[in-house]
Structure formats: C-alpha cells, structure tokens
Amino acid sequence: MASYSTNDFKPGLKFIQDGEPCVIVENEFVKPGKGQAFTRTKIRKLISGKVLEINFKSGTSVEAADVVDYNYTYSYKDEDFWYFMHPETFEQISVDEKALGDNDKWLVDQAECIITLWNGSAISVTPPNFVELEVVETDPGLKGDTAGTGGKPATLSTGAVVRVPLFVQIGEVIRVDTRSGEYVSRVK
C-alpha cells in the first residue's frame, strides 16, 4: 500500500488514521526555535465526520487511503436504501442512511451526485451544488410586511425547509444551494 510523508501533506490528501479514512482540511509546517520540527494538521474523519487536530513529527509517514470519488446519477429510493446508477457503465450502487446523512432532502430524480467509496462501499454522498425544487407549502406573503427579517419558511417537494423571500408562492420552482441550504433564485 502507498504511504505519504509529512512533506507530501496538503489539503484534500486522504490517508488512514486509527483504521478510518481521513482527509486533511488544513496543514502547517512548524519549526520551533528549540526541538524537532512538526506538521500541525486539522483532519476530518470521512466516516464519522469528526474534525481533529493532530501533530505529526517531521518525516513521519501515514498509509494512503483507497478512497475514490465517482459521479453517479440518483435513481430511486426504497424502504432502507437509496439507489444510484453510474452514467457510463449503468452499474447500480445502493447507499444506506448512514452514508447519505441529511443529504436525502436534496435528492431529485436524475441528480448528478458524487459518491465516495472506500474498500468498495459508499461512505458519503455529495449532492449537486444547486438543485431546483418546487415550493409545496409556505405562508402567503403580505404586502408591506417587511418589519421582520424579510423572509419566511417554505417546505419544498423533498421535505426540506428553507427561508425564502416574501414574494415566493406555493407552486413556484426555486433554486437552492445545497451546501448552505439557502434560497438562491426563482427558476423561470
């Protein structure tokens, strides 16, 4: 198996720490006035999502993680699993709720998602950055009612709830940023 030295560390590098795949979020080389140089890293564990700060002595090596990202198209959901299809090979993969997390509220038919695989099993699903969803429930926007925040909650066709401007009505299709869960615009 391949390994990385602390000299190879950079944000986005994936390696094994305590038997779990991790990705480097930040790293900094530190050379104190006295003592051995070290690399201060902030890592995120890909399965549990925990963020840790770990110091590695200069020259230490870590085992590379066999983690691969693939583009898949969302197909359908049954009781326990969500199914995705590879757009070129038409191979299907099933993903459980643990790997999907709370991203199920952004899945629409034929959405292009990035699935992260480790040892052949899915560990995370990243939905597209922007999705277009229909507003199925929201309060009517009253004219001149801008004393508050200027927004109102709206329930979308997938069950997600986002804050929208007062002019958005039931039945309209809106664009939502899935990374922040915020309203972007109406779709014409």
Curated annotation (Swiss-Prot):
Query: What is an annotated GO biological process for this record, any one?
Result: peptide biosynthetic process
Q: What top-level branch of life does the organism fall under?
A: Bacteria
Give the UniProt keywords, A-Z. Answer: Cytoplasm, Elongation factor, Hydroxylation, Protein biosynthesis
Using the record's annotations, give every residue carrying the modification N6-(3,6-diaminohexanoyl)-5-hydroxylysine.
K34
Q: Where in the cell is it found?
A: Cytoplasm
Q: Name one GO cellular component term.
A: cytoplasm
Query: Pathway it acts in?
Result: Protein biosynthesis; polypeptide chain elongation
Protein name as catalogued: Elongation factor P
Question: Which lineage ranks, top first, belong to the organism behind this chain?
Answer: Bacteria, Pseudomonadati, Pseudomonadota, Gammaproteobacteria, Pasteurellales
